[in-house]
């Protein structure tokens, strides 16, 4: 039994909210619920990550730990990317599917414990990783992302300094041989590594 957002089937009592927000210049609505990450607002880290991403129409994006969908869905709506969105949390995935429909966005959304069910390669892997699931999960998102990136593709994550940004940065440098801090704001770091 778990109420945590990184559980497969959170058992928290339902508490549906509707968020009306503007992301990347697009007006969007999102259903959220108890047992999912950041249910009352689009968290600051996700908003910062979106502002720092450089993506183009038709490119492929893998959103790891997508939650109810704000990252992948807003990128698909604003830029016409092909979004693939995965999460372990079935409640979050149900919401992400409903949110895709509500916002008239096409996306591929399915359950996967990190990359377990993912196939193929992508131009971009993005993540606002589930810090509370532990450093091991964050490091696995970083380490294995390389296997799912095209050459020249990139991994971009958001992480707070106090929640391990320096160690995430050094892990990204170990894996990719490079890591750029795209932005620092209010203790949040946007980190990007390119597969060379």
Q: Residue spans of the language-model regions?
A:
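N-terminal auxiliary segments of SAM/dcSAM-dependent transferases
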Residues: 1-24, 34-39, 187
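Conserved class I S-adenosyl-L-methionine
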Residues: 160-177
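Short conserved AdoMet
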Residues: 54, 150, 177
């Amino acid at each position: 039994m778990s109420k945590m957002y990184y559980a497969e089937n959170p058992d928290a009592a339902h508490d549906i909210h509707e968020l009306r927000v503007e992301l990347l210049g697009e007006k969007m609505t999102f259903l959220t619920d108890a047992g999912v990450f950041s249910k009352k607002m689009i968290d600051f880290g996700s908003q910062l990550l979106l502002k720092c991403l450089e993506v183009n129409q038709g490119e492929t994006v893998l959103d790891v730990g997508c939650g109810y969908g704000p990252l992948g869905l807003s990128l698909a709506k604003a830029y016409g990317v092909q979004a693939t969105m995965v999460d372990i949390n079935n409640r979050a995935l149900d919401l992400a599917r409903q949110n895709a429909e509500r916002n008239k966005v096409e996306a591929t959304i399915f359950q996967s414990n990190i990359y377990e069910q993912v196939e193929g390669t992508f131009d971009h892997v993005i993540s606002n990783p589930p810090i509370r699931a532990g450093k091991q999960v964050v490091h696995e998102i970083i380490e294995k992302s390389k296997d799912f990136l095209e050459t020249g593709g990139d991994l971009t994550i958001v992480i707070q300094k106090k929640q391990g940004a320096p160690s995430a940065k050094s892990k990204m440098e170990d894996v990719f041989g490079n890591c750029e801090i795209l932005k620092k704001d209010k203790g949040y770091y946007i980190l990007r590594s390119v597969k060379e």
